[in-house]
A protein has these predicted regions:
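Short hydrophobic/Thr-rich beta-strand motif most characteristic of the beta2 strand and flanking loop
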Residues: 48-55, 63
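Charged docking surfaces used in two-component/phosphorelay signaling
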Residues: 38-46
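Receiver (REC) domain active-site loop signature in two-component systems and cognate sites
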Residues: 78
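C-terminal output helix
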Residues: 129-138
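Active-site beta3 strand of CheY-like receiver
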Residues: 67-73
Length: 150
């Protein structure tokens, strides 16, 4: 588990190993809010990830084939093509069906989570997110699970 800067960890080596596994993971962040995009970019770049930013679903669909991200964060409430439609289009494409899509929303309702699952999202993250929650979410999908490493 990642902790905030200056917090004690079980082992500094363990933390460094954890962060090194995130290094070079390519992450696409789709959000119409420049503040959210920039916050996510700062947190992810600090962890060594490569970050691709998109302002809306159409922008994301144009970039996904070129960049082939390992993980996609997708805001629900966006103009033109909302997050549900964007996620659905990504998951219907055989090339990107296996790419994890994490829905971002300022609402933490059961309906929003269920609707996200219905269009194929893999997880749901409530905004505002913390650095730790963002990196742990990426790690969930990028790092091998304990069963794969045993």
């Amino acid at each position: 588990i990642l902790r905030g800067a200056g917090s004690p960890t079980r082992s500094e080596g363990g933390l460094l190993a954890y962060l090194s596994k995130l290094r070079d993971a390519k992450v696409l962040v789709i959000d119409d809010s420049n503040t959210i995009r920039r916050s996510a970019e700062i947190f992810l770049v600090q962890a060594g990830c490569q970050v691709v930013l998109a302002e809306d679903g159409f922008d994301a669909l144009a970039k996904i084939a070129d960049h082939q991200p390992k993980v996609i964060f997708c805001d629900i409430m966006m103009p033109r093509l909302d997050g549900y439609q964007t996620c659905s289009l990504i998951k219907k494409n055989p090339r990107f069906k296996a790419t994890p899509v994490i829905m971002l929303s300022s609402k933490d309702g059961l309906f929003d989570r269920a609707r996200g699952r219905m269009v194929g999202s893999d997880q749901y993250l409530t905004k505002p997110f913390t650095k730790d929650s963002l990196l742990q979410t990426v790690a969930t999908f990028v790092l091998p699970s304990a069963s794969e490493t045993s």
